[in-house]
Swiss-Prot record:
GO cellular component, one term: chloroplast
Places the protein is found: Plastid, Chloroplast
Protein name: Uncharacterized 3.3 kDa protein in rpl11-trnW intergenic region
Lineage: Eukaryota, Sar, Stramenopiles, Ochrophyta, Bacillariophyta
Main location: plastid
Length: 27
């Protein structure tokens, strides 16, 4: 279950960074 949540969060993070490159670069 933890692995599933890890992969889910990783996928969401990848999509968020892809859709918001400016936010990623400003971190």
């Amino acid at each position: 279950m933890k692995i599933f949540l890890y992969l889910l969060r990783k996928k969401i993070a990848e999509v968020w960074i892809f859709q918001n490159p400016a936010n990623f670069l400003s971190l």
